[in-house]
Amino acid sequence: MCKMYKVVETDASPGQRSVLQLVKDLLILSRFHKYNPWLAVFSGGVSLPILIGNSHPLTSGVSVWATLLAGANQIATHPASISADHIVKQTLLCLICGYIFCGAGMVWNDWIDRNIDKNVARTKNRPLAAGRVTATEGFIWMMVHVAAMIPVTISTILYPFGKRQLCRRLYIYPQYFLGFSLAWPGAIGWMAIKGRQIPFTQSISESLPLSITVFTWTLYLNTAYSYQDVVDDSKMNVNSAYVAAGSRIHMFLVILAGLVLGSLYLQLRAQNSGWLWASWMCVWALSFVHQLLRFDAKKPESGGPLHKENFALGVWTIVACAAELGLSSGMADQFFSNRVFRR
């Protein structure tokens, strides 16, 4: 058991390979060839000190939704205190950091689970499980692009261990750690915009509904996606929410979708935006109904398309939040009043 977690690889090294092939496998290990890392861009990620304005350090939380929503709220209530350009720059920094952080989390998950992944049909060809990248190379690669704040780092490290039996006895599932990793930066993204104007406790309370939305949404989409592995994971007695749900998996997903929409209602009520009610709440509600009607507990592979559809929801929500910023700041009016649109 201990050999599984050794940093130094004791197995035979991969055969001869080019540097280009190694680089390709490392990028695959981080899932940079897929859409998965963009999920962290939508709702969670890391924090880092950056210099803004008059060289004041500010912590930029990787939460694009939170940053855009907080920016729209701030510019609507105190237009002289902040500019739309500043909000956009903060959002771009959040996007970049979240993307890199998620890559590190993907590597860590595969590094811990490499011996399990060898026995699961969907994951046996991943670089670490297939032996194309050694454990040492994978660990070093992860350290290269780890730049995370402490709470999220700890949660990300604990995520793969949540699949072990100790956590089962404590009724702790790995989806909880993943949900926290993506939800906590919602507060950081909020403070990246409003942290100087309001107390810390107020930032937490204002961003809490969004963080809960992201937490429950992550539980929903990860449970549906991971359900594809339920047959192999059940044989190995892997601890996970979808294994525990068993035959009641469909009802479990319905409950999670309801919790997502309930917490989203609280967030949008505070935003008081007709545009967000239409573009966010209505779109998500219709999408969830469509997803849950398509999901079939007897066909685990039906969980895969749900994950992709939620990725599309995340992209759309960035567009919706960016449009809200444009509407709140008056940028939309300026854009459409440009002479290009005049006859």
Swiss-Prot record:
GO terms for cellular component: plasma membrane. GO terms for biological process: terpenoid biosynthetic process. It comes from the Eukaryota. Pathway: Secondary metabolite biosynthesis; terpenoid biosynthesis. The chain crosses the membrane at residues 38-58, 62-82, 92-112, 138-158, 170-190, 241-261, 273-293, 311-331. PROSITE patterns: UBIA (PS00943). Disruption phenotype: Accumulates triacetic acid lactone (TAL). It is a multi-pass membrane protein. CDD domains: PT_UbiA_COQ2. InterPro entries: Prenyltransferase (IPR039653), UbiA_prenyltransferase (IPR000537), UbiA_prenylTrfase_CS (IPR030470), UbiA_sf (IPR044878). One of its GO terms (molecular function) is transferase activity, transferring alkyl or aryl (other than methyl) groups. It is an enzyme of class 2 (transferase). Its EC number is 2.5.1.-. It catalyses: triacetate lactone + (2E,6E,10E)-geranylgeranyl diphosphate = (2E,6E,10E)-geranylgeranyl-triacetate lactone + diphosphate. The keyword DNA-binding does not apply. Its cofactor is Mg(2+). Keywords: Membrane, Transferase, Transmembrane, Transmembrane helix. It is found in: Membrane. Polyprenyl transferase; part of the gene cluster that mediates the biosynthesis of meroterpenoids called sartorypyrones. Within the pathway, spyF catalyzes the prenylation of triacetic acid lactone (TAL) to produce geranylgeranyl-triacetate lactone. The biosynthesis of sartorypyrones begins with the production of triacetic acid lactone (TAL) by the NR-PKS spyA using one molecule of acetyl-CoA and two molecules of malonyl-CoA. Belongs to the UbiA prenyltransferase family. PANTHER family: 4-HYDROXYBENZOATE POLYPRENYLTRANSFERASE, MITOCHONDRIAL, PRENYLTRANSFERASES. This is Polyprenyl transferase spyF. It comes from Aspergillus fumigatus (strain ATCC MYA-4609 / CBS 101355 / FGSC A1100 / Af293) (Neosartorya fumigata).
